[in-house]
Amino acid sequence: MSFRFNEAVFGDNSFNERVREKLSTALNSPSKKKLDILKSGIKVQKVDFPTIPQLEILDLDIITQPKSLAKGICKISCKDAMLRIQTVIESNLLLINEQDTPSFTMPQLINNGSFTIPITMTFSSIELEAITNIFVKNPGIGISFNDVDLDFKFDCSVKILQSTIERRLKESMHVVFKDVLPSLIFNTSQNWFTNRGESTSTIPGKREHHHQQTTMSRNVILDGSDFQELSPINMLRLSSIVSSRSTLSLHSTVMNSLSAIPGCLERQNLYRFISRMPSLNNYYSSQSFPQPKSSTVSSKQLVKPFYCSHNLLPKTVLDSSQYDLATITKIQSRLFDRSNSNDDNAKPRRRKIKCKKTRTPSNLQSQGEQAVDDSTAIETVTSTPVQTPIPELEEQSPPYLKTTVSIRDKYVIPEKISLNLDSKKDTSKKKPFYFIGLNSQEPSNNWKWGMEDSPPPYH
């Protein structure tokens, strides 16, 4: 889908004059930061569009948008345009940052005056091709440039500065398409729609135009018909944000609320709510107890807090023993019911203490003596050193044996320990045992000289 401009509008010089004045107002806007190098305002001398621009509509969204809004994506092409700008610059670079520079860093020169140079910049053969997003509403048209391809020829009256200015202009050209041109097109469209039936020959001055931009009526910002275009989901989110200023929502205090909003508790009334909470400290702090007589009183005792968040008995109550177990049980039960209101199966964990009969002093003394005796008995057993030599019993050998060879291990098993072992006598499975060597002098005792099959190993 394509779009054609009216050739008669571009053929008339009035269009170029309007663009020139609008561009001069945008470049000299007071909202922009004025460069110190510029000694005067920027004046647009000439604007010319010999070739009619081309506009191609790539996408148009009208159905999904409200009736007062239209969105589209367009491609703009412009060729052979010309722009001439004139201004005055400061050539003495020492005076540019004179206000922000300390005096002791400035050199004392013989002639340190201002030296201004008038400069004229001409942009010719401008070729522009850009993809834009267009938003059309009743007051005007808004355009944002996304993809811009720009080429031009630059000519400066001061040739020594031409290369530097051209490089800086190309680097900062994105500011022109991001801020200057969109504001220029929007202001022009506003003036065009408001004065559609009237002549546009009279153009307001600089101050009047700036006042027209800054002063806006309240109906333009938010009209009554705009509420129908707002999404109900967004309205619900906005209402939740507004209601979030009241925090700490307590559903259990809807009837007896401490604030104007039912079900909510404001932070400035939080101490009042805590003071009404059932606790041991809040209950006993309301009663008056005699203060201890002491010469030195600390600052913490002089200043008594209005409430306490801990469920503890005050020290004065414990010292004076003016507490009641039934009252403490009632308060603790109320706290438990309040904390477990949603859980019916929860049971309180109570600490049970069994009280027995008091012991007589004689029983205590006898038990103490018995404990002492037990401790001494234990000490006598444990105090035996480990390295104490244990006397070994002599072996009871027959009197007719003179030379014996012991085959027992060097570790002697005590009789007490050996009795605990499960030693069952089984004579049928016992293997024959033989002594090796000369063990007897009398052959009548049936002692053998060794193994029957092999002689003893004599060396």
UniProtKB/Swiss-Prot annotation:
Modifications after synthesis and translation: Ubiquitinated by a SCF (SKP1-CUL1-F-box protein) E3 ubiquitin-protein ligase complex containing the F-box protein MDM30. Ubiquitination is important for mitochondrial integrity.
Chain intervals for the UniProt region annotation (Disordered): 338-375
This protein's record includes keyword DNA repair: no
InterPro entries: Mdm34 (IPR027536), SMP_LBD (IPR031468)
The protein's name in its UniProt record: Mitochondrial distribution and morphology protein 34
Subcellular location: Mitochondrion outer membrane
Compositional bias of kind Basic and acidic residues: 338-347
Subunit organization: Component of the ER-mitochondria encounter structure (ERMES) or MDM complex, composed of MMM1, MDM10, MDM12 and MDM34.
CDD domains in the cross-refs: SMP_Mdm34
GO MF entries: lipid binding
Family, per entry: Belongs to the MDM34 family.
Compositionally skewed regions (Basic residues) per UniProt: 348-359
